[in-house]
């Protein structure tokens, strides 16, 4: 029966303790029940309230998994929420329902669209794999390549949709006009390899180049203005490139400014927060692991670079030498390219047929220079000893200057040739017009009537392959051949071939093709075959090829990134003269992506110094923007400076290329629009507009600087706030530690408790019969300890010898038990176990639950004094001992403020005549402790105990909020030490504990809480009658605690020698023991007498 009651009480305690933890959730459940019941009755008819309730229920259904409820509660709440939503959602208006449904559908669609778009991001998984194995620096190259691929896709669409496709659809077909027909002398060699390689023959007279497009203002039935579209698209290519570059740079700047600095907790974030727990693929897990390792290596390198010491003088000298070598390399490469271009021009003028090398030597030399020079710069950069990121930027800048120098030297040479071709064309035009205007020459022979002659009609200018029949005679008028006008140009190109725009486009496309071939060759030779050589011949070589020369290749970020910039610069420079060049670049970038990624994953090894790339990559974009600006200048210069070719292109016949705009405005727009455009384009408007733009740029730049400064200040404030927070946390921890140290120092430093304990254990007690009160320093637990002592009048004749162990208990086991920490509930919460320091004394410890073990007195007598050891002290219950002082030590730990009215048992107090407080405990609350054999109690009480007035019962309790608020079990400690021992704070930690039962029962071992069997009611106790004195009083009989003593408590001589060490709490009350029933049945008078007889008198 008691076991069931104990289990019921235990379950009640657990239920009460869980109420505090689930208080918020129970409120939510109760609100849910209330709302459900209110909605069931139909009290809520407000649409707004219904809508809010429905939203609340939907949020609850969405977050039901996160609630700390049981499964039954979750299911019940989910059912109720669904019922409410299904029942009352129809009360809302259809508009609001449609709006909510539409918003939800839009969110779902946007999420699905985002997930769907991610699938179409090209090469995403490939780039992630490369980044995981080679770091963010190598991955930035492939991200940059993918971004350039996107730009070229847009440029291809622009040129293809507005230029190439309209010309193919609505323009004149191939062979219909002279500019779309291959000359007869070139037809035989049009399909030769060298002709195709040099982009001649059929490729020259195709949509690839400028000369194929017609000059008709309108083509097709729709009247599409192809020349105007060609010019506007050419300008739009540069405009779009500028806009997308600036937009990307601004976005990256915002991202880098908005991103939090990860300089704090550098390694903690990488070690503890870097793993992605959504990874379910072993390959992805391997890649993520490699990425984390690389990021840690990057962080380690950053920390090492911060602490690197440098010799300033040597470093400056080495950097000066490195810059001199770089300048010499740049000057040599520029001179070499200019020399090769000039030589090729001279060869074209002096030779009629050129070899394959002579036709392609310019492109080959430029590609060789661009491939070899960056490696030389890489060797030179090793002298400078910069940070790897700074080294990369210097390398990028130098290679950029090299590429720009190569391109500009090439462009200058090409423009010289364009200038010479323009002069020849002008001379040809002037000579032709002179011969036509002066006279007409007749042929020296009569031609057959059916024979057709190539001639020019009078007044039509220079034309070829135009035939017309003479009237009446077969005499044909012809123009003097060009060899008459210029005898030095025997092997000059025909007027149809003198198209400098097509020549520039051919050179740019040829340069791009040869650059691609050299890139493929360098990847195969430098990376692939080198890796094969190192891999398979390292075992047979004289040295280790993998760790020494030539070793495996590393991915060179600087020159590869600059190679992309250089390639895109060639596209921008030649896009106006070759509209299909962006389309070719798209194919080139696709092949480059797959080839480079294969080479990196197969043939390259990670860098020895892996450094973190810039978060924004704005340095790459800045170089690309600079390259765009410099590549736009030659094109703009050619458009403005040179006259378009007369025999090819959509602008033939115009004085300048941009005249097509003014011509279109004059012919296709009203007069007033032309006048407005003329006024706007006048210098009176242009100059103030330019000045206004400069002022606007300056203003925006000032705002940008101020925002940057404020952003820096905000970052510093955040860092200061973080440091202050860390300081506050450190101060709180330090204050807590100091408080604990102070509370620890207070108890051992108190002289009252020390004197009491020393007098209690000394052979000559102090001549003091008063009551001493002591307030414990452990004020955190709300405990006030009172030590009451009654000293004997005469000292003992001799000192006490150390006590010996119990018979039958091994010494090693006893020492082990005395040095063992306490277990159970009090072992984790008691201040006496953890927060207090102790003197190096040997304690015989009585661990008891106040609510389950009655307090009882014992007489202690030494047995076998010569055999007691210094580390253990054993006290045994013996018979009467008139001169031995008796010690009563009662200590309750961790009293709490929170009590429960229906849980804690009532407390009974009495005050005897001497002023001592006596607290009565019923015997039936004890359940756990084992008892020692008891002797029959004394037959009667002392007169002082009989005349002690009783105190009122105290009834105050509060319910426990949680399990930790339950009262801990009080414990009792009886300490013994020699007189010579002092409480040194340095040795307060060496405390030896012994349980009460170990002292008296030897091998008896009991756990902290073991339910004991109920005591038999057959045991008879004397039941003296109660003496009512005014108020109801209870005078209990002699308790079992007095049975240990052979002398009666009425003996004044012995009672005067008793010593009491009392520790009482001031705030808490004893909680009910675990397993006790919470309610007690009403008892009859006889049962009440028996229970009162069972009360145990204890001096507290």
From Swiss-Prot:
Annotated Pfam families: TMC
Classification lineage: Eukaryota, Metazoa, Chordata, Craniata, Vertebrata
Keywords: Glycoprotein, Membrane, Transmembrane, Transmembrane helix
Localization (cell): Membrane
Region entry Disordered, spans: 738-812, 929-956, 1005-1090
Native source organism of the sequence: Homo sapiens
Any one GO MF annotation of this record: mechanosensitive monoatomic ion channel activity
GO CC annotation, single: plasma membrane
Task of the protein: Probable component of an ion channel. Molecular function hasn't been characterized yet.
Similarity section: Belongs to the TMC family.
Membrane topology: Multi-pass membrane protein
Record's compositionally biased regions (Low complexity): 1041-1059
Compositional bias of kind Polar residues: 751-793
Transmembrane annotation, as ranges: 149-169, 193-213, 226-246, 320-340, 362-382, 394-414, 509-529, 570-590, 619-639, 680-700
Name of the protein described by the UniProt record: Transmembrane channel-like protein 3
Membrane side Cytoplasmic: residue ranges: 1-148, 214-225, 341-361, 415-508, 591-618, 701-1100
Extracellular topological domain residue ranges: 170-192, 247-319, 383-393, 530-569, 640-679
Glycan-modified residues: 264
């Amino acid at each position: 029966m008691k076991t069931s009651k104990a289990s019921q009480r235990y379950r009640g305690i657990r239920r009460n303790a869980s109420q505090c933890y689930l208080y918020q959730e129970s409120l939510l459940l109760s609100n849910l029940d209330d709302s459900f019941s209110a909605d069931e009755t139909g009290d809520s008819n407000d649409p707004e309230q219904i809508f809010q309730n429905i939203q609340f229920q939907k949020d609850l259904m969405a977050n039901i998994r996160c609630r700390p409820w049981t499964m039954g509660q979750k299911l019940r709440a989910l059912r109720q929420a669904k019922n409410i939503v299904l029942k009352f959602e129809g009360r809302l208006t259809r508009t609001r329902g449609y709006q909510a449904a539409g918003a939800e559908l839009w969110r779902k669609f946007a999420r699905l669209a985002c997930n769907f778009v991610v699938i179409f991001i090209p090469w995403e998984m490939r780039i992630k794999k490369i980044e995981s194995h080679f770091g963010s620096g190598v991955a930035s190259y492939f991200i940059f390549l993918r971004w350039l691929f996107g730009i070229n896709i847009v440029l291809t669409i622009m040129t293809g949709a507005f230029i190439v496709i309209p010309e193919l659809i609505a323009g004149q077909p191939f062979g219909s006009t002279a500019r779309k027909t291959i000359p007869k002398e070139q037809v035989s060699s049009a399909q030769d390899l060298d002709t195709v390689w040099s982009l001649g023959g059929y490729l020259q007279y195709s949509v690839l180049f400028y000369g194929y497009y017609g000059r008709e203002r309108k083509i097709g039935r729709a009247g599409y203005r192809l020349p105007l579209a060609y010019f506007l698209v050419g300008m739009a290519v540069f405009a779009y490139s500028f806009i997308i570059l600036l937009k990307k740079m601004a976005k990256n700047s915002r991202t880098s400014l908005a991103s939090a600095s990860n300089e704090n907790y550098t390694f903690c974030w990488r070690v503890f927060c870097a793993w992605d727990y959504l990874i379910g693929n072993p390959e992805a897990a391997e890649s993520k692991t490699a990425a984390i390792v690389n990021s840690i290596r990057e962080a380690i390198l950053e920390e090492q670079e911060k602490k690197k010491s440098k010799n300033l003088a040597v470093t400056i000298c080495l950097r000066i030498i490195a810059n001199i070598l770089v300048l010499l390399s740049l000057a040599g490469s520029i001179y070499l390219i200019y020399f090769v271009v000039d030589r090729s021009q001279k060869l074209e003028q002096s030779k009629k047929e050129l070899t394959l090398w002579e036709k392609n030597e310019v492109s080959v030399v430029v590609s060789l220079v661009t491939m070899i020079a960056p490696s030389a710069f890489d060797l030179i950069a090793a002298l400078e000893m910069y940070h790897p990121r700074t080294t990369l930027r210097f390398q990028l800048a130098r290679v950029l200057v090299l590429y720009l120098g190569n391109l500009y030297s090439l462009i200058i040479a090409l423009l010289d040739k364009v200038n010479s071709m323009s002069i020849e064309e002008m001379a040809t035009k002037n000579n032709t017009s002179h011969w036509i205007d002066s006279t007409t020459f007749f042929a020296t022979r009569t031609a057959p009537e059916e024979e057709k002659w190539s001639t020019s009609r009078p007044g039509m200018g220079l034309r070829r392959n135009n035939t017309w029949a003479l009237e009446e005679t077969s005499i044909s008028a012809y123009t003097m051949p060009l060899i008459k006008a210029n005898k030095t140009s025997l092997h000059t190109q025909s007027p149809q071939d003198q198209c400098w725009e097509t020549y520039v486009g051919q050179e740019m496309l040829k340069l791009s093709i040869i650059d691609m071939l050299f890139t493929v060759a360098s990847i195969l030779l430098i990376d692939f075959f080198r890796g094969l050589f190192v891999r398979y011949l390292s075992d047979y070589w004289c040295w280790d090829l993998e760790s020494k020369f030539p070793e495996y290749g590393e991915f060179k970020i600087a020159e590869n990134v600059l190679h992309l910039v250089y390639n895109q610069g060639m596209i921008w420079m030649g896009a106006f003269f070759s509209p299909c060049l962006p389309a070719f670049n798209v194919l080139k970038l696709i092949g480059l992506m797959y080839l480079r990624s294969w080479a990196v994953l197969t043939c390259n090894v990670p860098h020895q110094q892996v450094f973190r790339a810039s978060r924004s990559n704005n340095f790459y974009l800045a170089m690309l923007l600079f390259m765009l600006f410099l590549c736009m200048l030659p094109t703009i210069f050619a458009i403005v400076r040179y006259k378009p070719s007369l025999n090819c292109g959509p602008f033939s016949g115009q004085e300048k290329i941009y005249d097509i705009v003014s011509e279109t405005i004059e012919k296709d727009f009203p007069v007033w629009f032309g006048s407005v455009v003329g006024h706007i384009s006048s210098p009176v408007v242009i100059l103030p507009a330019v000045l206004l733009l400069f002022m606007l740029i300056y203003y925006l730049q000032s705002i940008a600087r101020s925002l940057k400064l404020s952003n820096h200040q905000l970052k510093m404030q955040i860092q200061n706030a973080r440091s202050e927070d860390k300081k506050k946390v450190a101060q709180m921890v330090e204050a807590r530690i100091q408080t604990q140290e102070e509370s620890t120092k207070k108890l051992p430093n108190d002289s009252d408790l020390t004197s009491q304990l020393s007098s209690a254990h000394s052979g000559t007690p102090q001549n003091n019969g008063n009551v001493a009160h002591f307030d414990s320093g452990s004020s955190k637990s709300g405990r006030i300890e009172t030590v009451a002592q009654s000293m004997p009048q005469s000292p003992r004749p001799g000192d006490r010898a150390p006590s010996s162990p119990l018979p039958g208990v091994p010494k090693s086991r006893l020492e082990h038990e005395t040095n063992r920490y306490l277990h159970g509930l009090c072992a984790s919460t008691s201040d006496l176990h953890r927060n207090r320091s102790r003197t190096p004394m040997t304690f015989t410890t009585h661990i008891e639950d106040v609510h389950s073990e009655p307090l009882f007195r014992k007489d202690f007598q030494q047995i076998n004094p010569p055999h007691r050891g210094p580390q253990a002290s054993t006290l045994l219950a013996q018979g009467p001992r008139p001169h031995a002082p008796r010690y009563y030590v009662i200590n309750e730990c961790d009293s709490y403020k929170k009590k429960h009215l229906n849980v804690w048992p009532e407390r009974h107090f009495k005050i005897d005549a001497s002023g001592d407080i006596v607290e009565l405990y019923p015997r039936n609350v004890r359940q756990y402790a084992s008892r020692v054999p008891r002797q029959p109690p004394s037959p009667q009480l002392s007169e002082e105990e009989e005349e002690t007035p009783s105190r009122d019962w105290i009834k105050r309790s509060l319910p426990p909020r949680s399990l930790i608020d339950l009262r801990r079990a009080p414990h009792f400690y009886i300490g013994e030490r020699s007189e010579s021992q002092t409480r040194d704070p340095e040795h307060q930690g060496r405390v030896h504990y012994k349980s009460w039962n170990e002292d008296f029962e030897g091998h008896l071992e009991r756990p902290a809480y073991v339910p004991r069997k109920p005591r038999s009611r057959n045991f008879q106790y004397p039941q003296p009658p109660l003496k009512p004195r005014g108020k109801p009083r209870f005078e209990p009989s002699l308790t079992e605690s007095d049975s240990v003593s052979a002398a009666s408590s009425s003996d004044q001589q012995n009672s005067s020698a008793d010593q009491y060490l009392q520790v009482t709490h001031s705030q808490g009350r004893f909680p009910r023991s675990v397993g006790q029933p919470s309610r007690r049945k009403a008892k009859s008078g006889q049962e009440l007498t028996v229970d009162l007889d069972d009360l145990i008198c204890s001096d507290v």
